[in-house]
């Protein structure tokens, strides 16, 4: 387990699967560990696609989650909160960063996971910059 302000940074370079397909198993593992997740994307389409994918991820189980934009949602109670804003309102241990979402290297999470598609050159470049910064700080 990492210290506050010293999260472990993990990077997922997606080449053969979509982010929505890859996110389900990762989120399931986080929840099995008792971790809450803040899933951050600046792209409203991605947030909607992830929400839809999590509803149908596994026929045998349900991944509890909510979108911060949903009317009447108590964001603080969501085990997985899908949001545009990087504010940790659900007291998550893990930040899942998508589509070039920003997060300080010394964020107050136990783990920061960056998922990026190989075909998206700008996002891939940003992920490389984050990797270098996290690596230089000894957080990878």
Region roles according to the model:
Residues 1-47:
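Long, hydrophobic N-terminal alpha-helical segment
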Residues 26-29, 54-58, 112-113, 129-133:
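Short, solvent-exposed amphipathic alpha-helical segments in soluble enzyme
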Residues 78-115:
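Active-site-adjacent structural patch at catalytic or cofactor/ligand-binding sites
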Residues 15, 41-44, 97-101, 117-118:
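Structural motif
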Residues 5, 33-36, 50-59, 63, ...:
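Terminal and domain-boundary regions
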Residues 45-49, 122-123:
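Short, charged/polar "capping" segments at the starts of alpha-helices
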Residues 111-140:
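Glycine-rich, aromatic-bearing surface loops/beta-hairpins
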Residues 52-92:
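Helix-adjacent hinge/juxtasegments
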């Amino acid at each position: 387990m990492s210290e506050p302000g010293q999260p472990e940074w993990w990077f997922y370079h997606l080449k053969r699967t979509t982010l929505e397909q890859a996110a389900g198993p990762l989120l399931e593992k986080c929840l099995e560990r008792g971790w809450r997740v803040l899933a951050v994307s600046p792209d409203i389409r991605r947030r909607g696609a992830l929400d839809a994918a999590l509803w149908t991820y596994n026929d045998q189980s349900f991944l509890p989650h909510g979108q911060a934009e949903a009317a009447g949602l108590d964001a603080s109670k969501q085990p997985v909160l899908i949001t545009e804003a990087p504010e940790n309102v659900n007291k998550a241990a893990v930040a899942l960063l998508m589509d070039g979402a920003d997060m300080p290297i010394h964020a107050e999470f136990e783990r920061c996971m960056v998922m990026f598609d190989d075909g998206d050159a700008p996002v891939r470049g940003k992920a490389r910059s984050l990797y270098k910064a996290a690596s230089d700080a000894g957080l990878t």
